[in-house]
Amino acid sequence: SGSTGRTTVGQLLTPAGQLTTLGDLPLNEALSPDGRYLIVSNNGQGTQSLQVIKTATGKVVQTIPYKSPESLYMGLAFSPDGTHLFASAAGNHKIRTYHFDCGKLVETSAIQMPVVSPKLTKVNLYPAGLAVTNDSKRLVVADQLADAVSVIDLATNKIQTTHIGHRPVWVTLSKDSTKAFVSSQGGADVAEVDITKSQPLATHKINVGFHPNKSVLTPDGKSLYLSLIHI
């Protein structure tokens, strides 16, 4: 009431803004490069979904549902020109890809993540956080259950994977897209990964508080802000 609003999970906000009703367990969102649309990934029980919200009105203009066993996860990333969106589908061992135009998503061919290692052992990469390089040529993936990070060549879908940290969950790229900063929830650290080589290379580890999650780089590229679930 008045200037205070209540969110769908019971939190009180003052002053109250506009609330948009979403699906179950929204874990992540991605703003289109032009700022006109917000994509939300809903990752709860039963039917999961992607929703497209028009930022000028707060209205949901498209919902794409996925019934079990099809799934989504927290990874969402636009190409720099805003024409393509990538969404992780961890339970399905793939990255979903979409064409995006005028507020509408059209799903195209998915990128299949490997389920067998070069040594022919079973692997479950469980793709989580995603980031696209400035030239739109590569997609960087945090492989949460494999303790690894992968770089995908978007022209060939060739995947190069390097082991890092413990339970990596989020990826943020440097301003020039030469480095990836990968948050490891189980390792209480952020790994700095050189992605300019044919094989990604972890070069530095930054120890942070317990359970690091999402991060964002300042516009000048000099500072990385990180959310910690437990301190």
Q: What name fits each language-model region?
A:
Residues D34-R36, D81-T83, D135-K137, D176-T178, ...:
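Short coil/turn segments that connect the beta-strands within blades of beta-propeller domains
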Residues Q18, I64-S68, T108-K122:
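Surface-exposed loop and turn segments in beta-propeller and other repeat-based domains
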Residues S1-P15:
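Blade/loop signatures of beta-propeller domains
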Residues K54-G58, F100-G103, D153-N157, I195-S198:
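Short loop/turn segments that connect beta-strands within beta-propeller blades
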Residues I229-I231:
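Conserved small/polar residues in nucleotide/adenosyl-binding loops
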